[in-house]
Structures are given as structure tokens and as C-alpha cells.
Amino acid sequence: MTVTENSLHGVRRLWAEMNGYGIGYGNDLRPDLSNLQYALQALKESGAKADDPAFQRAIKFLERSQNLSEVNRNSYYNREDDNKKVVSGDDGGAVYYPGNSMAGYVELEDGTLVARSYGSMTYALLKCYLFAGLDITDPRVAAALAWIERNWTVEVNPGFNSLRDPRAAAQGLYYYYLSLAQCLGETGKKFVTT
């Protein structure tokens, strides 16, 4: 193994120890919830059971991607916004990867940021938790379901700040529909209570 390969291996291992196992691609060495949901869905559809180690190792990454401080106590630093500290919120929704949201951030009074939860990632999170064998009585699942109920819509991908950018709420709208449909199919729910 070359020094570069060894360094990359070390970075990946450190990320996994801190944030759990996920799936990603490209040169930046970090996984994301979008890719993870399809990897776990492929495992499930190939016959893997909820107790499969791949599902169980993914749980920590799912927790780190959820705005639920009871399971996500980590903080991160936002490279795009003057390296500001990013902490978990408590709305129960999900972000693209730990500390990062395509929907932007909310700045708290002390200057720290909370990555905004949004629809497509919250459905991806819920679907993955179900693949890993968690049920609706689990607080992580219940929090994601509560976010979905509070933010239910088929007009936009909820969670994006349309006041800042009127086009933002349409970001990934068809992807949102796909995530919503696949997730609700996994829950067995025919209706969402709002």
C-alpha cells in the first residue's frame, strides 16, 4: 500500500468510526444518505435480512444524518460558511450527510449552524431505518415520522427556504416524489396524518 493509499484508508476508517458506515462516490471520501438508501435497498431486495451487518453498521451514519440530538451529539464544521460549527437540531428530519444539507442552514443566536432537514432525505432516512429492522415505536423512527407529518406536502420538497430563493423548494422535486413513494411503500402506511 502506498503512502497515499494508506492515508486514504485512514481517512475513510476515521470517518466510519466517527459517523458510521455509508456509501458515497467521488474524490471527497465521504458517504451520503442519498447513495446509502439505494445501497441498502439493493441489499434488502437481494434478500438480506435486517440483522445483516451492513444494515447494522449503517445505523450510526443514519443517526448522524438525523436532526435528533438524543442520538446525534456530534458537531461538524461547515467548509462553505467560514468553517462555522454545525450542530444537530431536534426536528427529527434528515440531512444529506452529517453536518451538511442541500437545503441550507439555520444560524442560531450563538453563531452555530443547524443543517436544515428536508423531505427527500427524511424519507431516505426512514426507509433505511426500516430496512435495519427498527419499527415505528423506536424514537428515531417516530421522530422522522413526526417530521413527515408536520411537513407533509406534494407541492415542494419540504425544508428548503423558498424565501431566500423562490426556486429552492423545487430542488429535487421528482427525486422527492420517488423517495416519498418508496418510503411509504416500506412503512405499509396508506395515509399520512397531518
Model-derived segments and their meaning:
Residues 1-60, 64-194:
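An alpha-helical repeat/solenoid feature that recognizes helix-turn-helix modules
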